[in-house]
Amino acid sequence: MSTKNKKAAGGNGVAPKQTRQQSHDSQDYSSFKTVLFYCMLIVFLPVLTFFVLKGFVLDQFLDISEVKVNIASAVGAVVALHIALGLYIYRAYFGAPGSKGSKTD
C-alpha cells in the first residue's frame, strides 16, 4: 500500500520539475538577450559614432582638415566604446534588479 501512496503523491513530481526547467530556460534566454544587446552595442556604437561624427558633424559644421576630422571621429568612437564597456561592466557587477540568483540543489 505504501507504493500506491508514493505513486499517487509522486505523480505530480513531473510538473514542478518541468516548471523549474522552464524557469531556467527563461533565465537563460534573458541572459542571452542581455549579452547579445551589449555585444551589439560594443560593436556597432563606435562604428556608428565614427561615421556620424565624420559625415554629419565635423565635415559639415567645422572647417578643419580631413586628417583632423578622422582623428576627432576616432577619438569619439573610442569614447563611445568606453561608455558601452562601462555600461556592460556596471550591469555585470551590480546586476539587474531582481536578478539575485537563489541556489537550488
From Swiss-Prot:
Residues 1-36, 90-105 are cytoplasmic. The chain crosses the membrane at residues 37-57, 69-89. GO terms for cellular component: endoplasmic reticulum membrane; endoplasmic reticulum-Golgi intermediate compartment membrane; ER to Golgi transport vesicle membrane. It is found in: Endoplasmic reticulum membrane; Endoplasmic reticulum-Golgi intermediate compartment membrane; Cytoplasmic vesicle, COPII-coated vesicle membrane. It comes from the Eukaryota. InterPro entries: Vma21 (IPR019013). It is a multi-pass membrane protein. Residues 58-68 are lumenal. One of its GO terms (biological process) is vacuolar proton-transporting V-type ATPase complex assembly. Belongs to the VMA21 family. HAMAP family: VMA21. Required for the assembly of the V0 complex of the vacuolar ATPase (V-ATPase) in the endoplasmic reticulum. This is Vacuolar ATPase assembly integral membrane protein VMA21 homolog. It comes from Drosophila melanogaster. The lineage of its organism: Eukaryota, Metazoa, Ecdysozoa, Arthropoda, Hexapoda.
